[in-house]
Curated annotation (Swiss-Prot):
CC terms in the record's Gene Ontology section: cytosolic large ribosomal subunit
The entry's keywords: Ribonucleoprotein, Ribosomal protein
PROSITE patterns the record matches: RIBOSOMAL_L33
GN (gene name): rpmG
GO annotation, biological process: translation
Protein name per its UniProtKB record: Large ribosomal subunit protein bL33
Origin organism lineage: Bacteria, Pseudomonadati, Pseudomonadota, Alphaproteobacteria, Acetobacterales
Top-level taxon of origin: Bacteria
Pfam family, one: Ribosomal_L33
Length: 55
């Protein structure tokens, strides 16, 4: 059986609230760090979320 191309990553809030999302990305197609603007319910606004490894 072939190894999957997708890996699970954690998107951590840049507002330092401790809030994070867990999502998947294609490791071969996207080699850089993922960054997207999403809603942080602790800060109650949209902020940048950056990729971090799941420990």
């Amino acid at each position: 059986m072939a190894k999957s191309n997708t890996i699970q990553i954690k998107l951590v809030s840049s507002a330092d609230t401790g809030y994070f999302y867990v999502t998947k990305k294609n490791a071969r197609a996207q080699t850089g760090k993922l960054e997207m603007r999403k809603y942080d319910p602790v800060a109650r606004k949209h902020v940048a979320f950056r990729e971090a490894k799941i420990k």
